[in-house]
Amino acid sequence: MSKQNKLTKVLDNDLDDIDIEEDDSTNRKFESMSEDEETPGMCCECTDQPAEVVCLQCQDELCTVCSTSLHRRGSRRSHIFKNKHGQELDYDELNKRDRQPPLHGKEDEKVQNNNNNNNNTNNTNNIEMDDNKSINNNNNNINSINSMYRGTSNLLNPLPFHHTNQQRNGGGSNNHQINNHHKDEDEEIDEDEEKFIHKNENFTDFIPRLSKDWFTERSKYIPIRLNIRERNDLRLLEAALHVSEYTDKIDIIHVGGSKSKRINDQLRGMCAILSGLLVASDFKKGQQLVENKDFFENEEFFQNVFEIGRRHKIMNPAKMRTEYGKMIHLLQDAADEDVKKNLSGLNMIKPLKTVFLFLDERNGLKLLEDPLLELATREVLAENKTRPQIQREIREKEHAIKTLSRRYSSSMLKSEEIEVCIYSICDNHTFLRENRDPVKKMKHLLKEYFSPNQSERGFSLALEHGIGGARLSHNHRKQYNYVYQSLSLWQHILHDMFKLWYFAEIDLLCGHRYQLSNTGQGLNRIQQCPNVGKIMHSILRQTQKKVGDDWVGSSVIHLGDHNVPNSLVFIDKYTQISRILSPIVLTIEYIPKITDPNLVAYIKNTFGGPQTLTKIILCDFFKHAFDGSGADNFFDAGSCIDGRLTSAWQWSAQIAKKPYYPIFLLSGFSGFDGSFN
């Protein structure tokens, strides 16, 4: 680009093109297609999924989710569809046939035919096990992992095995109305799982709730707990990321210079900092590292350090709040082939070390099939138990762990390593209790204090557009269903958060190009999220089937656009759910425990009593945390999948203005955002 053209673009405030059209051809890697440019073969409704069918009446090319959601009711249900093979299908045939998200490629079509002919989840498990074996053969190539999972991610069931079995047998599909006094099928199954994880009776008196398929499937996405040596490397990584200014140097609108050169300089600087910190902490080990002057010769060290950081963050979402974003952006650029060439072929990315892969490498997968694993991984909680009961459960659990470690130990798999795998699965149960259970409690509170069929005077959930900041217009019943369905969706998302996080990192670190753009929330990297998108559509479809055909609101999932630019933003957004809901649940549970006479009098005089105060808090949350507000403009607001959580963010930001805010403070509330330390 000539200097005159550059000057013209500067005067026109068109700086984005100047940054993209740098002289260095490497920078073209980071360009992206214009948002307005239509991609042929994509769904005309959501625009981010491949079109699978054509409606002969509407003449629209649609994906599986959009075609079924848009034609659920009314005269559209009688429309005829034609799939990519030329077959004509009515709505019922389409809904029955397309139970899975769309597959692509010859290998995917073969898998799909197997599913249609056999309808057997064992085929899926076999395919997944073969795929995971191929990971071990390609440990140093993240692109091979991405291509491998691109065809199989939609086969991986986002719910436990018995969830799928129950639904295929026809359960839960006839009840389309939410009843205040009856539990739906999804909640009953989740309660069975919760009883397994948090058993209150004697440990030995139990019926196995979770099959070996559940442990095998979940273990594919459960990271291995860090050992002491890895924790030392983690401290080095956190210190290096804390002082790094990587995103400040790279993610900027830069008029001149080569972006690839800046990336190369920053990556070399990060490697140098890590090497220096290692020398300072362990001179003997650091001396061996610095003897190799080329960073490529220390590739294994850098791969292990960054993998440890990724694994630690997944297991502890509240940790590395600022450092994790820097690390992912750094690795995202390091995955680019041109950047690797500038670093002498240095590859900083390796597959995540999960329980399944760890056991598979050491021929220990039989551990996941042992019925005793249920007892060994169950949580011991102190609620409503005496001290002798707690101590007995602890002894029984420890005995089960020791038995399994002796039974499956070998020359390739030590007993200590088996215990680490078992404790890692226990960490997954703890994650579910801390993150998913608040959503389940909010669903119970919704059912306990509100009825979908009639509203109590002064506690109606009805919304009207423009009143109280609402951008939706719902009557009481519709808003009740909308809240219930949103909470059910969040519950399923958090249930499979490890799986979503696993594939989110694959989307981020696969080497796909991104576009640096101002999304209204600052400069963000807009990148497509194919694997996360497929899993999210599968979760959405499962949720819609469980709550019935009467789905309220939009089914559009924003991924890879200005609302949710990339998988990193997606993960960060949905890990906030428990931070929003947990303080509300704690406050509601705290209110009946208040015994101070002055506080009791204050609540009675101001709010009308503890019961009324509870209803006021819940009514305000269920109304205005789900009213479609929170976006920068009208078009981005509403009832889409992403917008439901955006409204909850907006409500939490205004908590200090609520009349019941002092009650939150009394319960120990300090904020919804958690700690960044």
Swiss-Prot record:
Keywords: Metal-binding, Zinc, Zinc-finger. Pfam families: ANCHR-like_BBOX, DUF2009. Zn(2+) binds at C43, C46, C66, H71. A zinc finger (B box-type) spans 38-84. Residues 163-178 have a biased composition (Polar residues). Residues 91-142, 156-192 are annotated as: Disordered. GO terms for molecular function: zinc ion binding. Residues 91-111 have a biased composition (Basic and acidic residues). Residues 113-126 have a biased composition (Low complexity). It comes from the Eukaryota. Belongs to the UPF0652 family. This is UPF0652 protein. It comes from Dictyostelium discoideum.
